Amino acid sequence: MTLSNEYLNAVSMMIVYGQDNSGTDFNYYYYSATTYSTYAPTGVVAVLKNSGNVVATLTGYQISLSTSSVKFIFYDTSNNEYSFDEVDIYTEMNGTLALLVSRTTGLSYSKSASEAVVAYFTLSLSQSPSLYINYAFMYLLVPRLVLQNVFPFSNYVGITSYSVSQVSGTISFDGAGYSNGELIIFLTLSTTGGANPIITAVTTQASTTTPSISSNQVLQAILPAPLPSTSSPVQYPIQIGVQYEE
């Protein structure tokens, strides 16, 4: 299974803007707009299709959860008969399909009246820049995540500020977007240069359990080349972000 662009876009916007949010973010570099919604789902389902037609919708049941992994089981023990060549994992909002999380095609399965269908979906995260990014992935997929007290906070408000080190200067936020498996954050850096800038994005914590998380850092980027020294500040358009790999 491959994570959908729809789901990764929502995760990206939650990293930047926080949970329980929605809107349209305009990027003036690319003259494009990104719509997003970062509300928690009420359910997860597997939609089984045959030649594009829905043949069954199976309720998902969470069987394990950590800060970096979640596993669901879906099953159908009815006497229904059908064949399917596609499985789509969706979140639900009050019984209505919401985010397409993952899609698998090219299958070839059949169910008779005496057989059961059982499917599993597992999301595992590794090499994440911070626990806040893990939280965004889980919050948009796992129903009632906050009530399970897996994370040491229950309200992620997004990135609240950006700072620059190694060079003297200021940095401002211009927008964010998702493209080709990558969160892109657009910034303007005003500096006299002289070194490789390090840009850090931080949030404001809302801890609810102990031990609390020790850092407010969401992500950090080191520019690959030193900026030239100048007598007066120069403005540089900067892009930082997170690349998602499977």
UniProtKB/Swiss-Prot annotation:
<protein>
    <recommendedName>
        <fullName>Uncharacterized protein ORF246</fullName>
    </recommendedName>
</protein>
